[in-house]
Amino acid sequence: MVNYRIVVLLFLLLASSCNVGPKPIAYGTDGCHFCRMTIVDRQHAAEIVTDKGKVFKFDSSECMMNHLKDIDQKQVALYLVNDYNQPGELIDATEATYLISDRIPSPMGEFLTAFKTEQAAVDALMTYDGDLLTWDQLKLRFNL
């Protein structure tokens, strides 16, 4: 009976430790997995979560995209980016619309900014000029 309880307890512990979900970014403390800079910009940070629950944090979308060149993307469960209009809010990167505008600087100088909705990106385009991209177009731009 004691062995059964231990097995159940271990199973529950293991099952709960493999939670696949985003983790909050500790701005000013967490470092970018790709470039090692401290993550401070709440409008441009990004994160990926593997299918095993491992989280990689980035100071910019461009660092995340460059990191994707070095890993098996089939193991990524979640791609997340910060919404420019809601600093600190992680959104689904595959559903976001991206603006490349030299009038909105990003941490790594690629001027890449994510928006939760296409309309928000179009509104920003009218103000800042530049080019709009979908997730698939962004992957092509980064040769992914």
Segments predicted by a language model, with ranges:
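Sec-dependent signal peptide recognition
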Residues: 3-9
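C-terminal motif of bacterial Sec signal peptides marking the signal peptidase cleavage site
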Residues: 14-17
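Bacterial signal peptide processing site
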Residues: 19-21
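Short metal-coordination and nucleic-acid-contact micro-motifs, chiefly zinc-binding Cys/His arrays
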Residues: 28
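Post-signal-peptide N-terminal segment of Sec-exported extracytoplasmic proteins
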Residues: 33-73
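Short aromatic-glycine-(Arg/Gly/Cys) micro-motifs in beta-strand/loop hairpins
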Residues: 42-51, 91-107
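C-terminal partner/receptor-binding element of secreted or periplasmic proteins
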Residues: 116-144
